[in-house]
Amino acid sequence: MSLKLTLNFTELGKGDAMIAGGKGASLGEMTQAGIPVPPGFVVLFIIFDEFIKEADLVQEIDNIIDNVNHKDINSVEVASEKIQALIKNAKMPERIAKEINEKFKDLGTEFVAVRSSATAEDGADNAWAGQLDSFLNTKEANLLEKVQHCWASLFTPRAIFYRFEKGLHTTKISVAVVVQKMVNSEISGIAFSVHPVTEDRNQMIIEAGFGF
């Protein structure tokens, strides 16, 4: 049986965070519970791992991270720029590109949201919410590019700082990508049951705005 590279929301649940990231697993859990969720699929983290291996980037990325001085903003920014360029400029393997494009066609929509979903996201000790990039109103023509940009956002300056702040710089962190049908929402928002900055467990934060 061939290894699955993508899974629909209907195939995922809260126990799948290690393959679909926190966001992907949560969307699957809500879909399974019958909550109205715009349909979509998750490009599993294994694809990112396979992508950087096939592009021969693993050692190069590790070497750059190992030599970062996280207390020097210039050092972090230079490292971030180098790693992101490596990921964005590498060629996506044909079989991976084909599966992602086929899944997109199955959604039957013109526009999708392409959203990063870290495998360490929404954990008890670390919340990666807001650390990685997402792209709205993405069309088929630039879908693969935006997927690679989501992968690259694992190494933005803020994400690198966050790694060191949480002591995760030596921990393997991967990233899945959510591809979800766009909707014309009137209001959208996010809620944190623990304050994401102060980590105060007695304070809940809800942020909302018009549109998406």
What are these regions (language model features)?
Residues 195-196:
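Short, acidic, Ser/Thr-enriched surface-loop or helix-capping motifs
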Residues 185-192:
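Phosphate/diphosphate-binding loops
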Residues 203-205:
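Structured C-terminal cap/extension of enzyme domains
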Residues 1-178, 187:
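N-terminal beta-alpha lobe that positions the nucleotide/phosphoryl donor
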Residues 207-212:
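Short, His- and charge-rich active-site/binding loops that engage polyanionic ligands
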